[in-house]
């Protein structure tokens, strides 16, 4: 497995130009537990530098949408998502979800957002 760092946008463009779909897996850093996996396309989109996964592609058994929120002046208010491992260990803010979005950002509504690359508590693999 390869950890992607640097210009994921450039790498995604090159891979897609060759006709091979790019698959992205997001993992919790400490345990390497998978949090989400999908191929770029209808189930996975890159938006403003972050990955947004369709809810069907995330590991709902280890992800908990919280009441904690953040309000982006452009996109609207999102809820933070925590990782809860099988041992009960909780890692805060591994992802976020916008239940409703401001006009112009509908593509991310209801999707789970993760930072691209390796940042904070998650890491990206392809």
Residue spans of the language-model regions?
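Terminal leader/tail segments of proteins
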Residues: 1-126
